[in-house]
Amino acid sequence: IEYQSMNRKQGFPAILEHRIQLSDRINGTLTRPPGASGDVPAMVIMHSSGGIIPNTWEWSKFFLDMGIATFVVDSFGPRGITTTTMDQSQLSYPASTVDALLALKLVAAQPGIDAKRIGVIGFSRGAAAAAASSFENIRAAVLGDSPLKFALHIPYYGGCSQVGTTTGAPLLYFVGKEDDFVSAELCTVTVGKMKERGANVADYVQYPNTYHSFDVENDKPRYYIANAQSWKKCILGQDMDDLSYFADGKKVNLQEYNDYYQRCMTRGATIASNFQAKTDSRAKTKAFVSKVFGL
């Protein structure tokens, strides 16, 4: 299903100042669980920096087997992007967030879908969208007067630097302690701040001896991408309520934040599957989704 979404270069100020340019046509694949009757819940699936991979469809099947429809968003293909691992500037993270929220609107309008039971799960870059779509002011700016909101948010190994007032929908976070794309330490701090703001954090799961993309099975159990962009060394913060920025513990303006963001970025990161973490996270995901959706 094709739909219009935000210009790939726009940022959060454009969203909150109602300057979104719906210039990018993207698409997603809606799959319903076989033999479904009545209105079923749905999960919007946001892919990683590698785009849609076999693991994306594995997750789709995982939810379909639970009797949940899935909508796999393709933020890359229609925009002519293959991967953003070496260059994340090809698509802004806010644009991915808008991709997710407009997918919610699209899926909610489909027959046979329960609009009150639509969740979002995202991986790496997609996790940033799964998390940012929980902020009430972002949701309201994108969806306008509509009361639509995601029923739950599941960010898998995404960067955690944003805090703010959420819609109240529960969040379930997963991260590997050894992740060298993003900082697990920063995630711990950020999730703590989210709780202070009243966020409904169902669980924050950090796996020891676990790297990025731990749920993805590859030809090699572990490999190093020398040219991958990493922000593990960055101490970043964004307050989404007033759109203030923090770098290295200090409050800064947007230009200073962007300068620091480029400066603290390093090259080289690890992808490693971890069967134990994958199995445990899937069990926790299943229990969480079942509880929220009342399955």
Say what each PLM segment does.
Residues I1-G38:
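N-terminal cap/lid segment of alpha/beta-hydrolase-fold proteins
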Residues I15-L16, S92-G168, D180-F181, E185:
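Primarily recognizes the serine-hydrolase "nucleophile elbow" in alpha/beta-hydrolase
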Residues T84-D87, G159-L172, K220:
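Flexible "cap/lid" loop of the alpha/beta hydrolase fold
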Residues V201-L295:
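C-terminal catalytic histidine-bearing segment of alpha/beta-hydrolase fold enzymes
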